Amino acid sequence: MGDITGEAIVLRNASVLAAEIGGELVLMSVSQWHYFGLNSVASDIWERLASPMRVEALCESLATDYDGDIQVIRKDVMELLSKLASRELIEVEA
């Protein structure tokens, strides 16, 4: 898998199971059988990926909603998306 860019389209992998456990959203990859816990901001990102979304639009909407620095948000989002993609929890379309 190559680097995820701002122009890439990302969305949830439809086969991933999600459940709230102890106030944390936990994802399970059926294909790889691992669990992945998400904090509140990562859970918000997961909710937004219910529909396909361009990475840069995701970063911009988070910067607006959280009143944060777009550069910091972009870095953090790219890191999270890379982790999710490497575990087959999201799909990435170049």
What are these regions (language model features)?
Residues 21, 34-94:
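Long, charge-rich, low-complexity alpha-helical segments
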Residues 1-29:
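Long, low-complexity, charged/polar intrinsically disordered regions in eukaryotic proteins
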